Regions:
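Glycine-rich phosphate-binding loop used to anchor ATP phosphates in small-molecule kinases
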Residues: 61-119, 169-183
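Structured core elements
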Residues: 25-28, 50, 100-102, 123-125, ...
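Walker A (P-loop) phosphate-binding loop of P-loop NTPases
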Residues: 3
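Hydrophobic positions on the alpha1 helix immediately C-terminal to the Walker A/P-loop
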Residues: 9-13, 28
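Conserved NTP phosphate-binding and transfer environment spanning the P-loop NTPase/kinase superfamily
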Residues: 110-206
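Conserved lysine of the Walker
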Residues: 6
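Post-Walker A helix-loop "phosphate-sensing" segment adjacent to the P-loop in P-loop NTPases
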Residues: 15-25
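Conserved nucleotide-sensing/catalytic segment adjacent to the nucleotide-binding pocket
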Residues: 25-27, 34-83, 99
Length: 206
């Protein structure tokens, strides 16, 4: 789900894969959003970034087929402030011993990896399952930790202030219930990215 630590985990996983003699290449699926003018809207007329239709599936499928065929691709970078993909000369070609580490909220959705054989995929579900309780009877919801993470991230990288992020959160949560949680059992493993000290650290940035 959103702000579960997918990007951080993919980079940490890449470090460990490299230590075992493999060559990992992290790939953020966020760079495969459709351009803003093609983004679907919800029932309130707001852009729905959480639905699978917000992803440029045709481009992603084409790039994956080329990579598996040994061809070189140009990797897009999505400019969230401008609302469009940009190409900045970043190339990628996979050789023997290379591992593509793809991360994104729809990575477990079968539509995202349609046409890719199951034996070429190892699926990991990541979430921040906060284990801190307020007292013996009240726990801190796991979504609270992710919301705080997202407030900090959006302010730093996407040009959104806290009010904008909080206003979008109900739509994000609806998207998770519809497009993400139904596929969590499809994962080969699950990883808890919550850190016991993180709320006290990131609160000053939120």
């Amino acid at each position: 789900p959103s702000s579960s630590g997918k990007t951080t985990f993919s980079h940490r996983l890449s470090v460990q894969l490299r230590a075992h003699g493999l060559r990992p290449y992290p790939l953020a699926l966020d760079n495969y959003f459709v351009d803003r003018e093609h983004t679907p809207k919800d029932e309130n007329g707001n852009y729905d970034f959480e639905c699978i239709e917000a992803m440029d599936l045709d481009l992603f499928h084409s790039d994956m087929k080329k990579l598996l065929a040994g061809e070189e691709i140009s990797i897009p970078t999505f400019n969230f402030k401008q609302g469009r993909k940009e190409y900045k000369g970043k190339k990628l070609k996979l050789n023997a011993g290379d591992v593509l580490v793809a991360e994104g909220i729809h990575a477990l959705n079968p539509l995202m990896t349609e046409g890719l054989s199951d034996d070429s995929k190892f699926k990991i579900y990541i979430s921040a399952l906060t284990q801190i309780n307020i007292d013996d009877h009240n726990r801190i919801p796991t979504t609270d930790g992710r919301l705080i993470r997202r407030i900090v991230r959006d302010a730093r990288t996407r040009g959104n202030d806290a009010r904008e992020t909080i206003a979008m959160w109900p739509s994000v949560r609806r998207g998770e219930e519809k497009y993400i949680f139904p596929y969590q059992e499809e994962a080969d493993v699950m990883f808890n990215s919550a850190l016991i000290y993180e709320l006290s650290v990131i609160k000053q940035y939120a």
